[in-house]
Amino acid sequence: YKGKYMKGWEDVRNARFKKQLELGLFERPDQLTPRNPKVPEWDSLTQEEKERYDMQMAIYAAVIEEVDRSIGRVVEHLKEKGVLDNTLIILLSDNGGNGEPGIEGRFAGKNPGSAGSTVFLGAAWADVANAPFFLYKHHGHEGGCNTPFIVSYPNGIDKSLNGTIQKDNYGHIVDIMPTLVKLTGATYPSSRGGHKVCLLYTSPSPRDGL
């Protein structure tokens, strides 16, 4: 991935949103929020700074690829065991991209990206990771709390919903436990937080608001 991000965070963010529009994740071009004013323009950086930030994002991209590969290994194992269709797999993030501790993020260690090193995206690349939303982790804006919730459950989700994007159903992480209780038929105290996510066992019912 080294060199892929030398075009800068503005161009990468715009390109990602264009792809999101093509995929149907969003419908209107005006849904792309303004760039974080605290983030410097890419062209204002020195060549050394650009190379450093490019490597920072390249390392992050490589980590995401490894996560994807690892999930694939789990899925293949479940297929081999013949239990994939009756297995519920949930993939989500607890918050938006990590803008800590500021624009520069963290890029520590003799060989950033290796074991023992510390690499954080920083606010500039977190702004890209959360496109088209504004801000990132720690903030109440959508960039901090509106994250994907990806579910695979072949025997439990209507096949007509395969590959679809449910944009009108909102949930919270506390909703996962009551959903699992419903699906497994487990017995738990009736007094608990969260609500059952209806998509997993009945017809979707959009919320009026968030």
Give the label of every model feature segment:
Residues Y1-G171, M177, L183-K196:
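Active-site-proximal cap/lid insertion segments
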Residues Y201-L210:
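Single conserved hydrophobic/aromatic residue that forms the stacking wall/gate
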